Amino acid sequence: MSVFGGIVMLRVNNLSIHMAFMGVMAFALMAVSPAQARSGEEIMQEANAVMGFFPSAVAEVNLTTGKGNKKRERLLRLVSKQGDGRRQLIATFREPASVRGVGFSTELDVATDKRQSWVYLPSLGRVRELKGGQQHESFFGSDFSYSDLMGRDAAQDTHKLVGEDAVYFNITSTPKNSADIYSKLDYKVAKSDNTIREITFYNRKGQALKRLTNIDFEKVDGVPVLLNSVMENLKSGSVTSLNRTSMQVAIELFDYDFGPEALQ
């Protein structure tokens, strides 16, 4: 479920940063009869269709990261695309000058859950590939990891409906890849439009690590799209918030717009 689709410009407060955001945009609604019982797998497949409806998009987002009064601001350009079993993302800092040109790109093969990621530091003048656990480290000091920035695909996990109320389905998802950094994820999926409203991430010890709350949505071409979200580190109390100010969808993008060459 991508928190981010398309090109995104982010203005960030207190970031050592999305993403997720980017990734984080919400998408197409599938109508389901209230009387029809659905499994956890079906609910998450429908949520995946909503949160990943648009194959690409362009947005501007204000992003704030930090704790208390210690906050910084960043302008970040995000480009994402999905289709044919692949998800691609590129993120480049534009402001302030101290981080201008710093970039990150990642590509995920959904079927194999294989990911390649790279970072570009202008001060070094070269692209560096992120290996193994480096992809799960903090995205430039934010409360998102590099892998969080793109978001997850429903096919990466198994899903169980563990409860519901008048407003939400409660889903527990377990990664299929035993090497995944998370042991499980708890979702709240809105019954009204199949959007994901909350995700709690658990570490390998089963401890709640952080929580993503998707606060506001708006309709774009009749589809609910994320406006505001907050990622909270439940250990440190640090918070990263993302507030979108504009967006374009269905932007034509190509493979050469992503990857290590596109970062330079």
Can you name each region flagged by the protein language model?
Residues 32-37:
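Sec/Tat signal peptide C-region and signal peptidase I cleavage site
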Residues 18-31:
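Bacterial N-terminal signal peptides
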Residues 39-122:
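N-terminal mature ectodomain segment of secretory-pathway/periplasmic proteins
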